[in-house]
C-alpha cells in the first residue's frame, strides 16, 4: 500500500461477541488486512475496572453498566491500524453503532453483517484524532505514536512493508 499523504493511526477493537466466533473473527481480520496496514495487534481480556476506566466518559448513562459488563465478559482484540484517513475509513467500515439501523441502512458494514445488539455490535473505533491517541495509549501503553510517525511512518507510506503471517502485523521491509 503506497500513499501520498501521511498515514493516520486509529484504534480498532474486535469486541467479545465477535471474538467468540472464529469464522467472524477471521472475516473481520481479513477485512482489516484488505484495507489497512496493521501496526500492532493484541488479544486481551479486561477486568471490570479496565472497562470502567476506558468508558468513564459514559458513566451515568443508561447503557454504562451493560457496556462495562459486556466488555469484560471475554477476550477482545485491539489493533493499531494505519492508512490515509484511517479514522474515517474504519468508522465507515464499521457502520452505525445501532445494529438495527446498520442492518437496514448499511447492511454491507461490519455491524450490519455481524452485529447482534447496540452493545454487542462487534467493533469499536476511535472517533477523532484525539480519541485515537488516548485510546491507543490505553490499549498499547508501550507504543509511541509520535516516535512511530517520525521513524516508521515514511517507510510504511512508501510501501516498504511486509506482512508477517505469524504475528499478523505489517513490519518495515529491510532491504
UniProtKB/Swiss-Prot annotation:
Its cofactor is Mg(2+). Keywords: ATP-binding, Kinase, Magnesium, Metal-binding, Nucleotide metabolism, Nucleotide-binding, Transferase. GO terms for biological process: CTP biosynthetic process; GTP biosynthetic process; negative regulation of cell growth; negative regulation of mitotic nuclear division; UTP biosynthetic process. It catalyses: a 2'-deoxyribonucleoside 5'-diphosphate + ATP = a 2'-deoxyribonucleoside 5'-triphosphate + ADP; a ribonucleoside 5'-diphosphate + ATP = a ribonucleoside 5'-triphosphate + ADP. InterPro entries: NDK-like_dom (IPR034907), NDK-like_dom_sf (IPR036850), NDPk6 (IPR037994), Nucleoside_diP_kinase (IPR001564), Nucleoside_diP_kinase_AS (IPR023005). Its EC number is 2.7.4.6. One of its GO terms (molecular function) is nucleoside diphosphate kinase activity. Transmembrane segments: none annotated. The active site is at residue 124. It comes from the Eukaryota. ATP binds at residues 15, 63, 91, 97, 111, 121. GO terms for cellular component: mitochondrion. It is an enzyme of class 2 (transferase). Major role in the synthesis of nucleoside triphosphates other than ATP. The ATP gamma phosphate is transferred to the NDP beta phosphate via a ping-pong mechanism, using a phosphorylated active-site intermediate. Belongs to the NDK family. This is Nucleoside diphosphate kinase 6.
Amino acid at each position: 500500500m503506497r500513499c501520498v499523504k501521511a498515514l493516520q493511526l486509529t484504534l480498532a477493537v474486535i469486541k467479545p461477541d465477535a471474538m467468540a466466533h472464529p469464522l467472524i473473527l477471521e472475516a473481520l481480520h481479513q477485512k482489516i488486512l484488505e484495507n489497512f496496514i496493521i501496526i500492532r495487534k493484541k488479544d486481551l481480556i479486561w477486568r471490570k475496572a479496565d472497562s470502567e476506566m476506558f468508558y468513564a466518559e459514559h458513566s451515568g448513562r443508561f447503557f454504562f453498566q451493560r457496556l462495562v459488563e459486556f466488555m469484560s465478559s471475554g477476550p477482545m482484540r485491539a489493533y493499531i491500524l494505519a492508512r490515509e484517513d484511517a479514522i474515517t475509513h474504519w468508522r465507515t467500515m464499521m457502520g452505525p453503532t445501532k445494529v438495527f439501523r446498520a442492518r437496514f441502512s448499511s447492511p454491507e458494514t461490519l455491524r450490519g453483517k455481524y452485529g447482534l445488539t447496540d452493545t454487542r455490535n462487534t467493533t469499536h473505533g476511535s472517533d477523532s484524532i484525539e480519541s485515537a491517541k488516548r485510546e491507543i495509549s490505553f490499549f498499547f501503553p508501550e507504543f509511541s505514536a509520535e516516535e512511530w510517525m517520525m521513524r516508521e511512518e515514511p517507510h510504511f507510506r512508501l510501501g516498504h512493508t511486509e506482512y508477517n503471517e505469524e504475528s499478523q502485523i505489517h513490519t518495515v521491509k529491510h532491504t
